[in-house]
A protein has these predicted regions:
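Copper-binding active sites and cupredoxin-like electron-transfer domains
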Residues: 2-375
Length: 375
């Protein structure tokens, strides 16, 4: 079968379209032989990090003492059918550890991240992982291509502090195809002495939440109804045609419309400092906390740069992650949105934060209730 681009579709292509990265892996291996031997890390302590489903982060320290560690993590690739809205629209999501987005990994500058990446034997496609936080080999993508039933181990050194995207990048059109099927997540590399403001004062958070913004491109049938498919990869030619239009059918937080609202809303208390980590692997976004602000915002996500202060809306470039710290001063339900309001309200890019505590009339009060206009 061919799509409008003349690309031939078959299971063989699905499993073998990553020739570019396979060739790159050969070049990387050859070049590595000529490089200096890696540092001796055999005596570094090893820590197994238990990854958790977003929006939560794994257990971690904000400030560390002592030297670097090897952070061991395991992720399992699973192709699974998920429902992305209340109308029952489905997609075969490509996931790390079964979630969209994949789990947050947390390390400190100078640590080593050692990933064991597994692909379930029941999967249909070839996958890999590209860490924007890493250095070399296409972010590790050239060294991690695996088929169903395989695993690979990759270790990289965290030399850049900040929050970074990771995603699948098997080659050619399969790169955007995998990314817009949910195969992305984020890494946070903290400075060893923690976050700081522009004057070097320590900044700490009481809780942190990972919001992964995802654009989906679901094909429709001749009646305009979203199509459903029996297996992973079956939608490839039709999805590519929709993707070429650059108009998503859904823009959601954490995998589905309403995934972070209602009884799944994020939680905080008045006085809490909350760190929001926002990642978008494919499109630009404009996070805004309705009723609040970004007290300290690392808009580009890089903690070596001083944070901006007091922002109303911040900008996340497609293919990056950013972080915003806010101290909640009033109770109530806050809406955290992509402030392209069409995408927030009509396509799904909205989360809620439920904040408990006492109301402060000095910050805001209703002076007069709604009533007839006075003469």
């Amino acid at each position: 079968m061919k799509n409008g681009n003349g690309f031939q579709f078959s299971r063989r292509n699905l499993l073998g379209v990553g020739v570019i990265t396979a060739a790159a892996a050969t070049l990387v291996t050859t070049a590595a032989k000529a490089d200096d031997a890696p540092a001796d890390i055999s005596k570094l302590p090893r820590v197994k990090q238990v990854l958790v489903a977003p929006p939560m982060l794994p257990e971690h320290e904000q400030v560390v003492t002592g030297g670097p560690k090897i952070i061991e993590v395991t992720m399992t690739i699973e192709e699974k059918k998920i429902v992305i809205d209340k109308e029952g629209t489905e997609i075969w999501a490509f996931t790390y550890n079964g979630t969209v987005p994949g789990p947050m990994i947390v390390a400190h500058e100078g640590d080593y991240v050692e990933l064991t990446l597994k692909s379930l034997a029941t999967n249909a496609l070839e996958h890999n992982i590209d860490f924007h936080a890493s250095t070399g080999a296409l972010g590790g993508g050239a060294l991690t291509k695996i088929l169903p039933g395989q695993e690979v181990v990759l270790r990289w050194k965290a030399i850049k502090p900040g929050v970074f995207v990771y995603h699948c990048a098997p080659g050619d059109v399969m790169i955007p195809y995998h990314v817009v099927h949910g195969m992305n997540g984020a890494v946070m590399v903290l400075p060893r002495d923690g976050l700081k403001d522009a004057k070097g004062n320590a900044l700490k958070y009481d809780a942190a939440y990972f919001i992964g913004e995802q654009d989906f491109y679901i094909p429709r049938d001749e009646k305009g109804t979203f199509k459903k498919y029996a297996s992973a990869g079956e939608d490839l030619p039709e999805s590519l045609d929709v993707m070429r239009g650059l108009i998503p059918s859904h823009v959601v937080f954490n995998g589905a419309v309403g995934a972070l609202t209602g009884d799944k809303a994020l939680k905080a208390k008045v006085g809490d400092n909350i760190l929001f980590i926002h990642a978008q692997a494919n499109r630009d976004s404009r996070p805004h906390l309705i009723g609040g602000h970004g007290d300290y915002v690392w808009e580009t996500g890089k903690f070596a740069n001083p944070p901006e202060v007091g922002l109303e809306t911040w900008f996340i470039r497609g293919g990056s992650a950013g972080a915003a710290l806010y101290r909640f001063r009033q109770p109530g339900i806050y809406a955290y949105v992509n402030h392209n309001l069409i995408e927030a309200v009509m396509l799904g890019a909205t989360a809620h934060v439920k904040v408990d505590g006492q109301w402060n009339d000095d910050l805001m009060m209703q002076v007069a209730k709604p009533g007839p206009i006075k003469a």
